[in-house]
Regions:
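Enzyme catalytic cores with a strong preference for nitrogen-chemistry domains
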Residues: 1-355, 367, 371-380, 412
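ATP/NTP-dependent adenylation/nucleotidyl-transfer catalytic domains that generate, transfer
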Residues: 23, 168-170, 227, 236-239, ...
């Protein structure tokens, strides 16, 4: 396990009812297959050594002895596997029969875990044969035959988690089938005891509509418990006298379904679980309470995980599904507009002033402004869109700004700031030929000066345009475009800005749609340096790196606390064939360095609405000292 990833597997073997020897052989075969793929935790269905549908054969001594013999065989034949294997069987203890999971590692049974909730309704009549774990007064020791044929004592336990000695985050607890379907599943307490993975051995028969319910149940339980949920279901080979079992195996992590088997097929599913991410989420949520419980430890030799069964979205802020993406875009625009509308109404602002450059961010801010004014049933002429051409402005961006203002029906004002900037440079002794940071920032601050004074003049407020990606990189002029009276894009990363503008372009008609699409095709630029042959010469992504990389870095660093080495590893897998390793490392190092050095700009951000789980507001989700040292992160990034 590296960087907190562990591969787990759920298997549905081809069983023969009451043929323990055959079933053991199938379980061993699948366990070896899963282990060869790198699985460290391999789970089989409920009562898989005998079959779930044995009926009154569970009362037969021959079957109970056969199950224990089969367990001994499984232990012996899997002793060399670097994995934990969980199998189900009936176990008699002091005259009572329990439906248990046997946790097997290195040829030994670490413990038996009994089923708590024994269903006796509809098609289920388990209480005819089994008793609940609640009948136990404490831990019991059970005498069984070990892998070498010698007798050994194994504990029968409840409220227990299993922890790997070499990887402390690799912890799991066990529940069985019906345990999940009740109001207070054992998995709730197991997660609070520290289990990052919940294993469920199940024999859930199939009826119309049940698969969707089961899928949601597993997914939602993993979300509630901030855990991975490994669900192995009985399938082919169980008796079809009255029921059919589909082998519906599922693996979920924190509310997301990672793997699902095909219905009515036996086989194995795999997923790479991010244990560090789960631990980070629990640490972040102070309402996730911990309780005490017992632990059993096991040992596994460390094995490299190739992340073959783990994927990372290339644009984690943007849903891949178009229907969901459109729904999300509508929701985001409504959130932004509602936040702005509320502030406009509270301040009794007569106008709203926005610097409209013809670029992506200011276009989105204008879209939000239009939505907010429409919400308040205000005349759009109260929106003052100001274009402020200077040394780097191109005809394309200026023209698009003018077309946008006209199409949306807002007031357009043009303030050419060249003369004012020239005068300012003369005042401070700045040469116009010195294209330094002063040359660039002087223009940005002059624009903010114009906007602020126009807001005062018209009884309005300045609406900020800067986005989340720019804030993370500090790609904003301090007290220039960094400052406003209300920033509507501060929680929107650049990759999402693009999709929001594209969504608006799809929604509207005619020339406005064409202008929005041209804005989307325009290179991202602050336009603070003179153009070349009338074209934009200063392209942001050439200077600080591709925004799709930076947004990827930003998401996994802030949302889940990934260290640079883990971000790099995920990025290499996700962007293989798009960026080479050296490029990813270069821009990751840039991101880390700039993220730390530019915190001072984020420490005094204007107000603005939160719309996603990753934001950098100093009053909300991200409270970081401006003088924090980046050495630990930067050293790790540079040494990749």
């Amino acid at each position: 396990m590296r960087d907190g990833f562990i591969k787990i597997a759920a298997a549905t073997p081809d069983l023969h009812v009451a043929d323990c020897e055959y079933n053991a052989a199938e379980i061993i075969r699948q366990a070896k297959q899963a282990a060869s793929k790198g699985a460290k935790l391999i789970t089989f269905p409920e009562l898989c050594l005998t079959g779930y549908t044995c009926g009154d054969l569970f009362l037969q001594e021959t079957l109970l002895e056969g199950a224990l013999d089969a367990l001994s065989t499984v232990c012996r034949e899997t002793a060399e596997l670097a994995a934990v294997i969980v199998v189900g069987l009936p176990l008699r203890v002091k005259g009572k029969l329990y439906n248990v999971a046997a946790v097997v590692n290195a040829g030994d049974v670490l413990a038996f875990v009994p089923k708590t909730y024994i269903p006796n309704y509809s098609e289920f009549y388990e209480q005819r044969h089994f008793v609940s774990a609640d009948t136990l007064s404490g831990m019991e020791n059970v005498l069984i035959k070990a892998a070498d044929g010698e007798p050994c004592w194994v504990p029968l336990v409840t409220d227990t988690i299993f922890q790997c000695d070499e990887q402390p985050l690799f912890t799991f607890g066990v529940e069985i089938c019906e345990d999940l379907w009740v109001p207070n599943p054992p998995s709730t307490a197991l997660a609070q005891m520290g289990a990052h993975i919940i294993v469920n051995l199940s024999a859930s028969d199939e009826i119309i509509g049940k698969a969707g319910y089961r899928r949601d149940l597993v997914r939602q339980q993993s979300g509630r418990l901030l855990c991975a949920y490994l669900y192995a279901d009985a399938g082919f080979g169980e008796s079809t006298q009255d029921l059919v079992f589909a082998g519906h195996d599922l693996i979920a992590e924190n509310g997301a379904l990672l793997a699902e088997s095909k219905m009515f097929e036996q086989g194995i599913i795999y997923a790479d679980i991010d244990l560090q991410r789960l631990a980070h989420e629990r640490q972040r949520m102070n309402t996730f309470e911990s309780i005490e419980g017992s632990e059993f430890s096991f040992s596994l030799e460390p094995v490299e995980n190739d992340l073959a069964d783990r994927s990372f979205p290339r644009t984690p802020f943007v849903p891949a599904n178009k229907a969901l993406r459109d729904e999300r875009c509508e929701e985001i625009l409504t959130l932004q507009a509602t936040g702005l509308a509320t502030r406009l109404r509270h301040t009794h602002a007569k106008t709203a002033v926005v610097g409209l450059s013809g670029g992506l961010d200011s276009t989105l801010a204008l879209i939000v402004l239009v939505h907010a004014f429409d919400m308040l049933e205000l005349d759009r002429k109260g929106i003052l869109a100001v274009t402020m051409p200077c040394f780097g402005t191109t005809a394309r961006t200026k023209g698009n700004a003018e077309k946008l203002a006209e199409a949306y029906g807002v007031t357009l004002e043009t303030v050419d700031i060249k003369a004012a900037v020239d005068q300012h440079f003369m005042d401070i002794g700045q040469s116009k030929d010195d294209l330094s940071v002063t040359f660039e920032n002087g223009q940005a601050r002059m624009r903010t000066l114009v906007l602020m004074n126009l807001a005062n003049k018209t009884g309005g407020m300045v609406v900020g345009t800067g986005d989340l990606s720019e804030l993370a990189l500090g790609w904003a002029t301090y007290n220039g475009d960094h400052m406003s009276m209300y920033g509507v894009n501060g929680s929107i990363p650049k990759t999402l800005v693009r999709y929001l503008v594209a969504y608006e372009a799809d929604r509207v008609q005619g020339e406005l749609s064409d202008v929005l699409r041209d804005v989307l095709d325009t290179p991202v630029s602050p336009e603070l340096l003179p153009p070349k042959d009338g074209e934009i010469s200063q392209k942001t992504e050439d200077l600080v790196g591709p925004y799709e990389l930076h947004d990827f870095f930003l998401y996994y660093m802030l949302r889940f606390g990934y260290p640079p080495r883990k971000i790099y590893r995920a990025a290499r897998k996700t962007f293989a064939g798009v960026y080479d390793d050296a490029t990813i490392k270069k821009w990751l190092t840039t991101f880390v360095r700039r993220f730390f050095t530019q915190q001072f700009k984020r420490s005094c951000l204007p107000d603005g609405p939160k719309v996603g789980t990753v934001t950098l507001s100093p009053r909300g989700d991200w409270r970081m000292p401006s003088d924090a040292v980046s050495a630990l992160w930067l050293r790790e990034a540079e040494n990749l």
